[in-house]
Curated annotation (Swiss-Prot):
Family: Belongs to the NGF-beta family.
Lineage: Eukaryota, Metazoa, Chordata, Craniata, Vertebrata
SMART domains in UniProt: NGF (SM00140)
InterPro entries: Cystine-knot_cytokine, Nerve_growth_factor-like, Nerve_growth_factor-rel, Nerve_growth_factor_bsu, Nerve_growth_factor_CS, Venom_nerve_growth_factor
Pfam families: NGF
Propeptide: 19-125
Name used for this protein in its record: Venom nerve growth factor 3
Major subcellular site: secreted
Signal peptide bounds: 1-18
Segments of skewed composition (Basic and acidic residues): 47-66
Length: 244
């Protein structure tokens, strides 16, 4: 009887020893480990594919340099932004083509304060034309429509000025009408104003600036801000002290 019990116990122990081991304790290189490695690799591959697809659908944010370059490119602007425009200046023009150098021409279309196309280019400045018969300016000036990419705002900070905007599927450029001295001379003695008595006064011509409301880039959004542009050439006179 005891021999039978010993035989059964030995057979039971042999059976336990010969049973397959669990996957938690499988040594490296075993088939179970290979299956786990293959599964892990497959999951990693799927994760990489998903990451690539996500990057394609949601590209990484652009660098500051790229944003600055893009800010002067063709940007789609919400028409409602022009409804919020105040303090409109005749020196700021949105045009689909270069404005004429002569202010007498009326062929350029631009966006006005009412979000409509307007052909009245600087009409107010034509009310007092300058005649060439015996009339001369104290300082010679030159005016032209220019494109600005950067400017100084009213707070003294450099800002990025929008050049091209896309409104209603049409591209407009932002122009600024600037006036400056024709031949600015840093030496006041050599840039006397015309018609000023040099025996009593020291005089010189200088370019003055003012602020106009322009469309600029602030981060990733377009916004209206006051920027500084050249607007006139004026004469500065200083009384000579020797006469007192």
């Amino acid at each position: 009887m005891s021999m039978l019990c010993y035989t059964l116990i030995i057979a039971f122990l042999i059976g336990i020893w010969a049973a397959p081991k669990s996957e938690d304790n499988v040594p490296l290189g075993s088939p179970a480990t290979s299956d786990l490695s293959d599964t892990s690799c497959a999951q990693t591959h799927e994760g990489l594919k998903t990451s690539r697809n996500t990057d394609q659908r949601h590209p990484a944010p652009k660098k500051a340099e790229d944003q600055e370059l893009g800010s002067v490119a063709n940007i789609i602007v919400d028409p409602k932004l022009f409804q919020k425009r105040r303090f409109q200046s005749s020196r700021v023009l949105f045009s689909t083509q270069p404005p004429p150098l002569s202010r007498d021409e009326q062929s350029v279309e631009f966006l006005d304060n009412e979000d409509t196309l307007n052909r009245n280019i600087r009409a107010k400045r034509e009310n007092h034309p300058v005649h060439n018969q015996g009339e001369h300016s104290v300082c010679d000036s030159v005016s032209d429509w220019v494109i600005k990419t950067t400017a100084t705002d009213i707070r003294g900070n450099m800002v990025t000025v929008m050049v091209d905007i896309n409104r209603d599927n049409e591209v407009y450029k932002q122009y600024f009408f600037e006036t400056k001295c024709r031949n600015p001379n840093p030496n006041p003695v050599q840039s006397e104003c015309r018609g000023i008595d040099s025996r009593l006064w020291n005089s010189y011509c200088t370019t003055t600036r003012t602020f106009v409301r322009a469309l600029t880039m602030e981060g990733n959004q377009a916004s209206w801000r006051f920027i500084r542009i050249d607007t006139a050439c004026v004469c500065v006179i200083i009384r000579k002290t020797d006469n007192f």
